[in-house]
């Protein structure tokens, strides 16, 4: 009997195979390095260690989960990120797994465009081509 984790990993292996077969993905490392070289760092550790006192909250953006099912389909990533920031979150965790969590790399990009808070990409990364 397959576990949900083994199902997720099987799906990620398929995604990696498709990415590796796609000619546009072959220069991923160079593109990633160029993006990183021009990016402003968003330092999670600094946010967690800040002297502002109180509890540090990493808020999570998630549409669904394998165990709970659909949480909410009508969520706007940018609206939620804005609310989290106003509510005092020091960072936002963004689920990007599509099949099992209803997330998307587009959610991560939209949230990045909305807030300067540090972001965590939460996904099942099994190969560097996924980054």
Regions found by a protein language model. Name each.
Residues 2-72:
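An N-cap/entry alpha-helix motif that binds or orients negatively charged groups
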Residues 39-54, 102-126:
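Alpha-helix-loop-beta-strand connector modules within alpha/beta enzyme cores
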Residues 56-60, 91, 118-120:
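Structural preference for beta-strand elements that scaffold enzyme active sites
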Residues 72-95, 114, 128-131:
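Alpha/beta enzyme core
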Residues 44, 67-71, 91, 97, ...:
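Glycine-rich, flexible loop/turn motifs
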Residues 6, 78-82, 109:
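Alpha-helical segments flanking ligand/cofactor-binding loops in enzyme cores
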Residues 8, 59, 84, 92, ...:
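Conserved, mostly hydrophobic/aromatic
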Residues 60-64, 73-75, 100-102, 121-131:
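Glycine-rich beta-to-alpha transition loops that act as phosphate-gripper elements at the mouths
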